[in-house]
């Protein structure tokens, strides 16, 4: 009986290891799928990254790849290098492609045109997550209605996808839940400035300080400059 149980446990562990995304897929693995194109995603996108320049090359991403490692909106605001029949380009992830299969992207027309023929409408592609072609430090978006009692904070202008955000309270780091709309949420954050800690998709960690949050939850959304950036 002990031998049977040991064998069963071993099979379960092997199955978990083999089929766990975290165990089998690196963040910068090459993905294969298809691309379509759309003119949306520049405003009102699922990840609340407005404003987005109208000439920027952007994409919506399928749900399976978006939530890498089981983290909601893990690839929101990231950059992807996409290759199609005509060449390569780099796009900014701004929206969800809800009906897209794993590997699928819904590109802006200017991005699609660089890698495929518009008349085809749908093309085969390969893509991977790459370091963002940006400069400067983070920017934080404080969502409308935020206060010291409840707050939703978004990290922008990051070189690599942000997987985790924590804040320090009473000498302890408290995890903030990442939401589908690409903000980290928590409650009872305190009355002073907020010490925060961010972890990127590679496991690199940086710390920063955000000015104290509003006392009441009546404020509009606003942004504050950060002082750090993920390392190369």
From Swiss-Prot:
<dbReference type="InterPro" id="IPR036908">
    <property type="entry name" value="RlpA-like_sf"/>
</dbReference>
<comment type="function">
    <text>May promote colonization of plant roots. May cause loosening and extension of plant cell walls by disrupting non-covalent bonding between cellulose microfibrils and matrix glucans. Has very low expansin activity (in vitro). No enzymatic activity has been found. Binds to peptidoglycan and to plant cell walls.</text>
</comment>
<keyword id="KW-0964">Secreted</keyword>
<dbReference type="InterPro" id="IPR009009">
    <property type="entry name" value="RlpA-like_DPBB"/>
</dbReference>
<feature type="domain" description="Expansin-like EG45">
    <location>
        <begin position="58"/>
        <end position="127"/>
    </location>
</feature>
<keyword id="KW-0134">Cell wall</keyword>
<dbReference type="GO" id="GO:0005576">
    <property type="term" value="C:extracellular region"/>
</dbReference>
<feature type="signal peptide">
    <location>
        <begin position="1"/>
        <end position="25"/>
    </location>
</feature>
<dbReference type="InterPro" id="IPR049818">
    <property type="entry name" value="Expansin_EXLX1-like"/>
</dbReference>
<dbReference type="Pfam" id="PF03330">
    <property type="entry name" value="DPBB_1"/>
</dbReference>
<dbReference type="InterPro" id="IPR051477">
    <property type="entry name" value="Expansin_CellWall"/>
</dbReference>
<protein>
    <recommendedName>
        <fullName>Expansin-YoaJ</fullName>
    </recommendedName>
</protein>
<dbReference type="InterPro" id="IPR036749">
    <property type="entry name" value="Expansin_CBD_sf"/>
</dbReference>
<keyword id="KW-0732">Signal</keyword>
